[in-house]
Amino acid sequence: MSRIGLKVIEVPAGVTVTKDGENNITVKGPKGELTRHFNPIIEMHEEGNLINFTRSSDSDRAMHGTMRANLNNMILGVTEGFKKTLDLIGVGYRAQLKGKTLVLNVGYSHPVEMEAPEGVNVEVPSNTNIIISGISKQKVGQFAAEIRDVRPPEPYKGKGIRYTDEHVRRKEGKTGK
């Protein structure tokens, strides 16, 4: 059983965590600022540069761990940031950037255009690699998943858009008689 909610979060130097009256927590750091609404059933306590969360009952255990993980991800985002890398594998598959619009040519009869959300940076170092970075783990991961969903990797030839560290399990083709 996980006990993530009980772990104490250490706030690094240069990062400020503030809570307003409506349970909105704002984290400011060298890379930017993130604000998120937190559930009032879990209480946040600050002691110097340490933050911990307490719950009133065991039925709130899942929310307890979720809130602790969300705040920790916000702190990591404003200090280090998050990055996802995708590879395009297939003949003629390529990506290019036009302003903030990512244009994908992945075997359809038309190019697929995707607008990057606010706070997410997209880089295309080569026409088969895409790097998505930002301070919000949720936005970076969501946009990377949306790009991957345009043409997910298929198991027979391995063609498609995949994360760089993703392993695609290959299948054997049909054997003829």
Swiss-Prot record:
A GO cellular component annotation in the UniProt record: cytosolic large ribosomal subunit
Keywords: Ribonucleoprotein, Ribosomal protein, RNA-binding, rRNA-binding
Annotated PROSITE patterns: RIBOSOMAL_L6_1
Record carries keyword RNA-binding: yes
Superkingdom per UniProt: Bacteria
GO annotation (BP), single: cytoplasmic translation
Any one GO molecular function term: structural constituent of ribosome
Function: This protein binds to the 23S rRNA, and is important in its secondary structure. It is located near the subunit interface in the base of the L7/L12 stalk, and near the tRNA binding site of the peptidyltransferase center.
Family indicated by similarity: Belongs to the universal ribosomal protein uL6 family.
Assembly and oligomerization: Part of the 50S ribosomal subunit.
PANTHER family: 60S/50S RIBOSOMAL PROTEIN L6/L9, LARGE RIBOSOMAL SUBUNIT PROTEIN UL6M
Protein name stated in the entry: Large ribosomal subunit protein uL6
